[in-house]
Regions:
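Bacterial Sec-dependent N-terminal signal peptides
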Residues: 1-25
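Beta-strand signatures of extracellular beta-sandwich domains
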Residues: 41-45, 85
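A short tyrosine-centered beta-strand micro-motif
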Residues: 80-86
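Short proline/glycine- and polar residue-rich coil/turn motifs
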Residues: 63-68, 130
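Acidic, glycine-anchored loop motifs typical of Ca2+
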Residues: 90-96
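A short, amphipathic beta-strand motif
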Residues: 24-33
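Short, flexible loop/turn segments at beta-strand junctions in immunoglobulin-like
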Residues: 74-77
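Short strand-edge motifs at loop-to-beta-strand transitions and within beta-strands
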Residues: 68-72, 124-126, 134-136
Length: 141
């Protein structure tokens, strides 16, 4: 009887150690791109105060456009609340360009297709929960 409990204890301990170190991933796919010039910027945020402008709380990538679809997988993420901001950096200058009046001159989209009034959407509108793995497909509108 003691031996059986010993094995149950060891199996339970081993299982909990495996789950403790487990991380999640987010696969982001941008579809129906309307041009092959420039690059796609994808920002992944977990901090409401920095969304979508600051580098704090952001993991970002720039992807070369080779086709009408690009994708990236963010790995080794802790479970939690995240939001995504994407823009088409057509001139590859690393910035989200705006007109003299402040209107965007490059295509953009946010997770949940969230929209803001006279600016970006709130983190709450664009956010989603990451528990294991998430697949997000977005298209510029």
């Amino acid at each position: 009887m003691k031996i059986k409990f010993k094995y149950v204890y060891i199996i339970t301990l081993f299982s909990s150690l495996l789950l403790f170190g487990q991380t999640s991933k987010i696969k982001v796919r941008i579809i129906n791109l309307q041009g092959l010039k420039g690059q796609i910027s994808i920002g992944l945020f977990n901090n409401p105060e920095s969304f979508p402008k600051k580098d704090e709380g952001r993991v970002g990538v720039y992807l070369e456009i080779k086709d009408s679809t690009v994708e990236h997988v963010f790995t080794d993420l802790e479970n939690g609340t995240y939001a995504i901001a994407v823009y088409h950096d057509e001139n590859s200058n690393g910035e989200f360009d705006r007109s003299f009046f402040g209107w965007p001159t490059e295509d953009y989209v946010f997770s949940n297709y969230a929209e803001g009034n006279f600016g970006p959407p709130s983190f709450e509108d664009a956010s989603f929960e990451l528990i294991d793995s998430v697949y997000i497909e977005l298209e510029f509108r």
